[in-house]
């Protein structure tokens, strides 16, 4: 057994011991963190720590060992809505979407985990098929949206299975070498790029609350908060936000809950000039404002897709009048003003220039006429050019453009068969393909510039060996 597989087994058994100690029959572990973000810092990558699966979405479900004796010894099959019959072998499973069907089987220990596509079977369906009535399934409410929690609760209760709020995330309890949280400094996003100063956005939000007769709205989506305040940060890989939460009131006041480490005292005056007066509190006190809102019978608006179940359950415990719907920042954030539209235009021109330079370089490198049209000579000459070299070269052309900040996501740089993995990440691969390992090269990449964000995907001929079937498939995709 490989070292990584052995670690997966040790960690899974440690989780099962926690379940047994807490008299919980099963657990569902979500990929997301308390902000319900797919882009996780290293200290929030719980499924990766537990199973080695590094995708940006998914769930892991485990059934307690002391419960195994109650389970049927006969093979269990689940028939889904498409009339597909799925065999449920193991008592540990990972559920992913179609982007990761190939990747998950390469990364996890298949001796202990079954892997399933979420379109075929979901964790709650798997548990309902395997567990007897009266069982208890634990989840960390912080890592599930409120709407997902309600859907889980309804599905499990139909099978007479209870959903339990775990006091602590079981992965956190066994993660002894867990990385420290990342708290980067708040950065001001200048009005010349955002097109609408923060005080105006705040005024618009307060007007909306008054029009709808809400006392307050709870905002737990860092992207919405950073948009509202016209700030940026570096707490997330390739996502320029700071982790924080907020309560906005109909009278225009804001309570911003954020770690002290995020704000440089020397910059606080400049920050207040930029966003207007704001009451700042340590994020660890966020539950206090929820209890206050609950006990005061306030009318509170929240987005059940971007606010986690812990937050809304806490509001429910008192007398808060909760209304649910699309977050009040979502639509204004999506409707770009003329400054933002002009910025995106400029960003895409810069990015287009960078990618044209990259493809010109690649065309010259892979021109067979340089190698006497000899495929063996070609392979020897370009053998040191792998997927990492290509990705880094593409970024180097972007870096020379004005106002470049960073990649907008991990570059998917894939030669040959690696392109079959929808979210292939060369930085996590055991072996990198090189030019000559396949005729096709696919690069999906993008960048953050001060004036806009880009995302471009291209598949190009980068070596000998193209077949009629490849041409046909490429043409069908292009169409």
Question: Where in this protein do the model-derived segments appear?
Answer:
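Active-site neighborhoods and metal-handling regions in enzymes and metal-associated proteins
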Residues: 1-479
